[in-house]
Amino acid sequence: MIARTSLALGAVLVALSCIAARAQDASDLLLATLWTQRSVEYKANALTVFALARIRLDEALVDRSWTAAPAEQTGDYQTLPSAIILDIDETLLDNSKYQVWMMKNDKTFSTKTWNEFCAAQISTAIPGALEFVKYADSKNVKIFYITNRAAETEKDTRENMQKLGFPLGGNVDTFLMQNEKPEWGSAKSTRRAVVTKDYRVLLNIGDNFGDFDDRYRSSEADRLKAFDSDMAYWGKQWLMIANPTYGSFDTAPYGHDFKKSREEQRKAKRDVLESWGGPAK
């Protein structure tokens, strides 16, 4: 009887530990998603960035030497018409409902479910985003969207953004999707180069380091070096929207190696964090 009771108790403990582990995995997104979807602090942060964007845009329109694409903007660009480059997801569109779905169903990101989410066309505008883009459009600045949404989602993306009131570019294709052309991979410099052929880029706004610099998938140390080398552009030509839910910051601790298990990925992230030593004994 004692043996049976011990076995039963052991089975219960194992089951509870498995449930706890699943709950812990699922909660990785909880605080970040709660902040972006529900907090006034996030709304204030986004509004602040887009308010600064208006100021920087006006400065850039006056200063003909100004460019937000230093690596791609070459030649006599000063007389070119003006444009800005914006990322879409978590820069202009709030996709936190997808994050919530993943948490509630204990799922991780997959292209299939993400594309289905895009097809639902339920993303909403980030606070301040639509107002800023309309302001830029009123200044005759061409709006280019360089996004790592896949090319097959372009129709749904356009329709979602049109419903919200974002300008679509008229007779110019302003949606530059990932893999729309063979050379348009996840790194965005090749697409920025397309824009700079015909436009002077005044601002670049995104939520991930990769929206600005192709070195985003390097080690944490190399990312920091790249960030430091770009220091003159942050807050001026380059503006960052806060996104704690996902991005290259999240994958850098485990070397962007997506073959690692969820447990290995989480361990790598915990291992790089600096901790207080605790109370003195």
Identify the residue ranges that each predicted region occupies.
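Substrate-recognition element of Asp-dependent hydrolases with the DxDx(T/V) motif
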Residues: E90, A129-Q162, F209
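Surface-exposed patches in mature extracellular/periplasmic domains of secreted proteins
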Residues: L61-Q73, I143-N148, G170-D173
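Active-site neighborhood of HAD-like aspartate-dependent phosphohydrolases
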Residues: P81-A83, L92-P127, E131, S138
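C-terminal cap/substrate-recognition subdomain and adjoining C-terminal extension
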Residues: V40, A51, A150, E154-K281
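Bacterial N-terminal signal peptides
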Residues: A8-S17
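Bacterial N-terminal signal peptides that target proteins for export
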Residues: M1-L9
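Non-catalytic pre-domain segments flanking phosphatase-related domains
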Residues: A23-L86, F258-E263, K267-K281
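Second-shell loop/turn segments in exported
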Residues: W35-A44, N115-S123, F144-A150, N179-K181
